[in-house]
């Protein structure tokens, strides 16, 4: 399972969302910078904090032209309860096949119980990886302030086609 590096195209993942419509990443995010978050599960306090942080920063992220999507192996009911609890407005996927997602993205998988370890990607508007953050445990993850700063930097210092 190779890791995704800057410049690599993000693989196509079709995810079921609690909103009812499946989405295909990165196609559904094309044209904007995007953050793709794999979180361990609703039971993880660090994941809850990260998701809340991205929700709190939603206006700043939107103003910077950054979209967010998150997913985990949790079932629909657990995922919907998490989204409701934190009033998450970005798409949240559920029921991810940890082995398939790991094979496509290089994310680490906890063997028992099976779940994806925290992994985050920043994608450019063409669906290529700008930054990948892999964690083999509870800590080490993207934060919205860093993402906004990175995208602002890229827009200011890149060729017009990349902005």
Predicted feature locations:
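Chalcogenol-based redox active-site neighborhoods
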Residues: 1-163
